[in-house]
Amino acid sequence: MFDSNTINAITYEKLDDYVDNFQKTKDVRTNMLFGTRDGSERPWVTVIIPTFYRKESLVDAIQSVLHQQDVAFQWEIIVVDNTPFDANNQTPALKIVAELEDQKVQYFHNEENLGPGYNWNRAVELAQGEWVCFLHDDDVLCRDALQQIGRLLNTKRNSKRKLGYLSARKVEFQNKFGLRLSTEFPRQPQEVLNRFGVLVCGHTGAGAPTCGTTILKEAYIKAGGINYDFGPSADAVLCYQIMRDYDVVTTDCVIGGYRWDENATLNKQTLLDFIRADDLLMAYAYQKN
């Protein structure tokens, strides 16, 4: 059993030490049950959707990717499922993917529940793309999200460092988001997020990696992936780790919708764990500077 909520304060003291978190799940098999890989044309971007017992909102998430318009590069969708099989060797996600029957979608099933963060790691391992676009199984992309991501990744930048992390601007929604375009929302300046900014603001500024946040696969793996020792702030720590060697920037437009609902993050204990984990991250950041 993998526990994503445990906070190891000692690990925070060695935050920049490399830990191979992919090794922690190497004995858990993941089987491809839908889709094909012929190796003829490798995608440039892989959209990953880790999932667990999700139904209707997963359909919305997948459809928001399948309805992308005017994408000038090769891309794929990977759904990686933590849900155990029922008596008929089915899961809600497997049924959905089979019914959609789209060649862009591949479905993988974990033989053991890895938890949310280590399922991100597994999805990144499985991604064929140079860039990995993150999408929660209840969130959505704008209809031109991949087009905007391609534009931003190809924009010439005045930096000697490689871009490693593109943090998606998003809007919150409930119920239905629809097939909306990024141009329906006000343009915003593209921000550079770095470790100095973490000291000033007290956070990375990136938020949860979803709604089109796109990370260089090389950078994700070099950072060691999500580490459950960092508790509920593991995704913020990953962004902070990537900042050390790569540039981290925001998009200049909204490219996705974040579904706001009653969930575990509103639980009192979860909120207290977030506060403690964030305090440990900031203690490390200030100690290093």
Where are these regions (language model features)?
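Short, flexible, basic/aromatic active-site loop/helix in glycosyltransferases
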Residues: 184-205
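Short aromatic/hydrophobic "clamp" motif used to bind/position activated sugar donors
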Residues: 132
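Catalytic core of nucleotide-sugar-dependent glycosyltransferases
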Residues: 254-262, 267-289
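N-proximal low-complexity "stem/linker" segments adjacent to membrane-targeting elements
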Residues: 1-67
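Acidic donor-binding segment of Leloir-type glycosyltransferases
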Residues: 64-108
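Acidic donor-binding loop at a coil-to-helix junction in glycosyltransferase catalytic cores
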Residues: 231-238
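Conserved donor NDP-sugar-binding/catalytic core segment of glycosyltransferases
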Residues: 144-182
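Glycine-rich, basic loop-to-helix element that forms the pyrophosphate-binding segment
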Residues: 110-127
